[in-house]
């Protein structure tokens, strides 16, 4: 299926309108829509590493379109070099759409699973209270631990982790961000 896509079916993205300040280093959130082919992730990671940057976060998953995946990549870097990376990503053969969401309105979320020690009823009650405040949920229970699932933005997850640290975090798994441009942002761009 992916090999049958023609150039006319690929989305063309207008360059983002933003002021690029030389030397400014900050976190960028880049989304990449790709054909779900072997080696695509490796080529993208190599391109970014080749510019001297580490991928801080990465989420990849299928989209509603058969044979198409979406990547959300977090990378900290200089605006000018990241702009070059975005342009080079657009040229990769299996890349269909690339967007730097850093300076446009967007929604981002991540998920964390946090296994916390709960050796007493008091600890269990307090961990449950914190979980409810953050709208998380307990997804696994053992005699000495609760495993909590929480979703939200980076600040929310970091705040919950800080509150759970005094109980002792036994284990934690955290996804990279998933991000999507806000609909109003897309419509505004189309009207320009």
Swiss-Prot record:
EC number(s) of the enzyme? Answer: 2.2.1.6
Query: Which PROSITE patterns does this one have?
Result: ACT (PS51671)
Q: Which domain of life is it from?
A: Bacteria
Known catalysed reaction(s)?
Answer: 2 pyruvate + H(+) = (2S)-2-acetolactate + CO2
Q: Which GO terms describe its molecular function?
A: acetolactate synthase activity; acetolactate synthase regulator activity
Can you give the residue ranges of the ACT domain? 29-103
The entry's keywords: Amino-acid biosynthesis, Branched-chain amino acid biosynthesis, Transferase
Q: Name one GO cellular component term.
A: cytosol
What enzyme category does the UniProt record give? transferase
- Tell me which InterPro entries the record gives: Acetalactate_synth_ssu, Acetolactate_synth/TF_NikR_C, Acetolactate_synth_ssu_C, ACT-like_dom_sf, ACT_dom, AHAS_ACT, AHAS_small-like_ACT
List the GO biological process terms: isoleucine biosynthetic process; L-valine biosynthetic process
| Pfam families in the cross-refs | ACT_AHAS_ss, ALS_ss_C
Q: Which Gene3D superfamilies match?
A: 3.30.70.260, ACT-like. Chain A, domain 2
Annotated metabolic or biological route of this protein? Amino-acid biosynthesis; L-isoleucine biosynthesis; L-isoleucine from 2-oxobutanoate: step 1/4; Amino-acid biosynthesis; L-valine biosynthesis; L-valine from pyruvate: step 1/4
- Quaternary organization: Dimer of large and small chains.
What protein family does this chain belong to?
Answer: Belongs to the acetolactate synthase small subunit family.
Kindly provide the name given to this protein in its UniProt entry: Acetolactate synthase small subunit
């Amino acid at each position: 299926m992916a090999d049958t896509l023609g150039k006319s079916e690929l989305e063309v993205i207008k360059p983002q309108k933003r002021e690029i300040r030389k030397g400014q280093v900050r976190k960028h959130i880049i989304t990449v829509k790709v054909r779900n082919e072997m080696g695509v992730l490796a080529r993208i990671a190599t391109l970014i590493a080749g510019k001297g940057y580490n991928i801080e976060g990465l989420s990849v998953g299928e989209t509603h379109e058969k044979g198409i995946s979406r990547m959300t990549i977090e990378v900290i870097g200089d605006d000018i070099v990241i702009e070059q990376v975005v342009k080079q990503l657009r040229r990769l053969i299996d890349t269909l759409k690339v967007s730097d969401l850093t300076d446009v309105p967007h929604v981002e979320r991540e998920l964390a699973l946090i296994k916390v020690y709960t050796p007493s009823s008091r600890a269990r009650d307090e961990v449950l209270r914190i979980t409810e405040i953050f709208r998380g949920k307990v997804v696994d229970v053992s005699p000495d631990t609760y495993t909590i699932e929480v979703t939200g933005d980076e600040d929310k997850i970091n705040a919950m982790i800080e509150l759970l640290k005094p109980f002792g975090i036994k284990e934690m798994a955290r996804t990279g961000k998933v991000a999507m441009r806000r609909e109003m942002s897309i419509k505004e761009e189309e009207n320009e």
